[in-house]
Regions:
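Radical SAM enzyme [4Fe-4S]-AdoMet core and its adjacent flexible, acidic
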Residues: 2-140, 150-159
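Membrane-interface junctions of multi-pass transporters
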Residues: 117, 122, 148-193
């Protein structure tokens, strides 16, 4: 993998590293972030374990809350350090929509004067992008609201154009995903964020 990263850099191609954290590899995160800096990698993507598809076999290996918070704090600290040193890198997390709220808590602890601005930015971002900014077209042409909704098809690009499928809010699921704000129920609906 490192050889490929170096070859891409030689050709001027922007490169990223992706890390899906489990109990077995969480301890490697600091070294990977160090490697990112040493090798001049442009983007780091921390993926929380998602139980869809292949991820389901690793369910028992998912990290505990304490480890997740440690990893997020390390990622935020690293990102802040890079910013302070003028290093322009991208840090992204995925598969846990609570990351934005945890970032807000981190900002409140470390830079309370920035908390209102951060909350406004997170509200502007809007949270989960399923059905809005993320789509999945599978190998058969079926369009899904995102990469984890394989069980739900909105249509097929062999029968209708993607824009027609994507803009069609007669489908109740798409109408709900495109609503702003979204009507969310259950535990997530009770959250203040």
């Amino acid at each position: 993998s490192m050889h490929a990263i170096r070859l891409c850099h030689q050709k001027g191609i922007k490169v990223g590293m992706r890390f899906t954290m489990t109990q077995d590899n969480a301890h490697e995160l600091p070294a990977l972030l160090g490697l990112m800096e040493d090798e001049g990698v442009d983007k780091f993507y921390l993926s929380h374990l998602n139980y869809a598809g292949r991820g389901n076999i690793n369910r028992k290996d998912d990290v505990i809350l304490k480890t997740t918070r440690w990893a997020m704090d390390l990622l935020f600290d690293t990102c802040w350090d890079y910013t302070q040193r003028g290093l322009h890198k991208e840090f992204v997390t995925g598969n846990n929509d609570a990351d934005g709220v945890y970032l807000l808590f981190w900002v409140r602890r470390h830079y309370p004067q920035l908390a209102d601005h951060m909350r406004a930015k997170l509200a502007q971002w809007g949270g989960n992008s399923s059905g809005v900014n993320i789509a999945n077209i599978d190998n058969l042409g079926n369009v899904h609201p995102d990469t984890f909704w394989w069980h739900y098809s909105l249509g097929n690009v062999k029968q209708r154009s993607f824009p027609d499928i994507w803009r069609d809010t007669t489908d109740p699921l798409m109408a709900g995903l495109k609503a702003s704000p979204r009507s969310i129920k259950g535990r997530c609906g009770e959250c203040n964020y």
